[in-house]
């Protein structure tokens, strides 16, 4: 009897051991598959120094091609007609209007010249009623002009408009426009939920000016710009060595100061300054040297603009979290990363926003508590292991650092085009103004951009290159450009 019982116990123990071994083998295979996905991702995203130099070289080549002729490059290299950036000498009251989405901002600033600088500024933000986004052109611009008129009416005693002068406005219009002068441009098409057919092909400055006249508001639009050029203007106002601006936020773009005689497609008279600001629209850059993965290709194919904005889809805040989601989905499907069932929410495109990715990536707690909390909040995944959380952080690290490497390579391309990527004997500073939430708030990303650029340039050159955070280009930058292109500028210079 005892022998039988002992045999039964031994058999049960053997079964238990076998089950445990099988479970451990299954677990090992699962982690092996997840690790294989991670290793392949790391390999495909790799951007060693040689490859980054090829990307920078390709950017410089495309810049040359885009300046030579319209349509000659994936980079539009748009002539902005901004031939003068703020010098710091500007004085007076100037306004800005920033229209780029469902809200718009109005801003006024009192400038006091070299000594006073920005004496005071005020702003207001107004929501656009949804029906005006798809109504008539007059209705939309009348609403904007009416809001601007109310804002002007609240102008206090701290703001001093010189006697006999017209108020002047910088207009940041973040929609596709064919610029025809510093203060005119025709709308190519609406985006971001706007759909007003009668405005397409019309000069948006003329539309705004007519609406201002209907409100009885005596105000002249002296500059039509986008947010990137505004960032360049704001950066130059603060630091005379700023030569380029880069937006690294939800989207991405770059603008820089070019010599007008180095723009073959410019057929007008050379500006007095000899300079011209170029809006690169660099998000549309592409090159065979860009490290693409299956996840990037699928994201691009399923996007609203397949084959377009490839660079932007690799480096901007709109897409980084989505790339991470796609990698984690593959791990969940092929390696049961989050258990036997794939979390339903993980199948929802763009559910992992880049700010969430940043929080997980920057988690420094020993048990990666923030990662666990975010996986629970966003995906509904309960009780993840530390090993799983580490894997998620690794995915974020690979995706974010590839983006930072490529952003740095793009900046290097601009420096190369301008001949600022080689040592100069007088140690002249070169400053790049950067704006955007991705750069401002995602610390690991920003630090990686800076360290990668330093490594690419080498010690001698990098000691003269500065990347500087420049906030609110679309607001203060527009007002500063209104001042720099004031109709009274030449009279003041006499």
UniProtKB/Swiss-Prot annotation:
Induction: By glucose or fructose treatment in leaves. Keywords: ATP-binding, Glycolysis, Kinase, Nucleotide-binding, Transferase. One of its GO terms (cellular component) is mitochondrion. Residues 226-472 are annotated as: Hexokinase large subdomain. One of its GO terms (molecular function) is D-glucose binding. ADP binds at residues 101-103, 250, 437. Disulfide bonds: none annotated. This is Hexokinase-2. It comes from Oryza sativa subsp. japonica (Rice).
């Amino acid at each position: 009897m005892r022998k039988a019982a002992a045999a039964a116990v031994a058999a049960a123990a053997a079964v238990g051991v076998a089950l445990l071994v099988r479970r451990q083998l299954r677990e090992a295979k699962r982690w092996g598959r997840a690790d294989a996905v991670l290793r392949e991702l790391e390999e495909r995203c790799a951007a060693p120094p040689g490859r980054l130099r090829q990307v920078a070289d390709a950017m410089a080549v495309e810049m040359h091609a885009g300046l030579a002729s319209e349509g000659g490059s994936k980079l539009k290299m748009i002539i902005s007609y901004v031939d003068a950036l703020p010098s710091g000498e500007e004085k007076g009251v100037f306004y800005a209007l920033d229209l780029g989405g469902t809200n718009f901002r109005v801003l006024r600033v009192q400038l006091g010249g070299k000594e006073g600088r920005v004496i005071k500024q005020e702003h207001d933000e107004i929501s656009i009623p949804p029906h005006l986004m798809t109504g008539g052109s007059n209705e939309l611009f009348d609403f904007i002009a009416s809001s601007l008129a109310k804002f002007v009416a609240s102008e206090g005693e701290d703001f001093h408009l010189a006697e006999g002068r017209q108020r002047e406005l910088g207009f940041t219009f973040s929609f596709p426009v064919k610029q025809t002068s510093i203060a005119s441009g025709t709308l190519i098409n609406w985006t971001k939920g706007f759909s007003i057919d009668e405005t397409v092909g019309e000069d948006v400055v003329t539309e705004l000016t007519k609406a201002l006249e209907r409100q009885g508001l005596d105000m002249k639009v002296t500059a039509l710009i986008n947010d990137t050029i505004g960032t360049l203007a704001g950066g130059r106002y603060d630091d005379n060595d700023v030569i380029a601006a880069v937006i690294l936020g939800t989207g991405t773009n770059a603008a820089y100061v070019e010599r007008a005689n180095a723009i073959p497609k410019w057929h007008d008279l050379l500006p007095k300054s000899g300079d011209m600001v170029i809006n690169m629209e660099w998000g549309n850059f592409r090159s065979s040297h860009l490290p693409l993965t299956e996840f990037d290709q699928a994201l691009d194919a399923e996007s609203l603009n397949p084959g377009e904005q490839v660079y932007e889809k690799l480096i901007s805040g709109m897409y980084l979290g989505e790339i991470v989601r796609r990698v984690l989905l593959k791990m969940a499907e092929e390696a049961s990363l989050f258990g036997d069932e794939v979390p339903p929410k993980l199948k929802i495109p763009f559910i992992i926003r880049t700010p969430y990715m940043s929080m997980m990536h920057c988690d420094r707690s020993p048990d990666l508590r923030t990662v666990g909390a975010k996986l629970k909040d966003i995906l509904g995944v309960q009780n993840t292991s530390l090993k799983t959380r580490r894997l998620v952080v690794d995915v974020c690290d690979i995706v974010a650092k590839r983006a930072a490497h490529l952003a740095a390579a793009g900046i290097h391309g601009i420096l190369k085009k301008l001949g600022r990527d080689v040592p100069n004997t007088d140690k002249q500073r070169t400053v790049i103004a950067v704006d955007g939430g991705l750069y401002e708030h995602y610390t690991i990303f920003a630090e990686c951009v800076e360290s990668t650029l330093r490594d690419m340039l080498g010690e001698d050159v990098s000691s003269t290159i500065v990347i500087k955070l420049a906030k609110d280009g679309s607001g203060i930058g527009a007002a500063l450009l209104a001042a720099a292109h004031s109709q009274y500028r030449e009279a003041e210079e006499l």
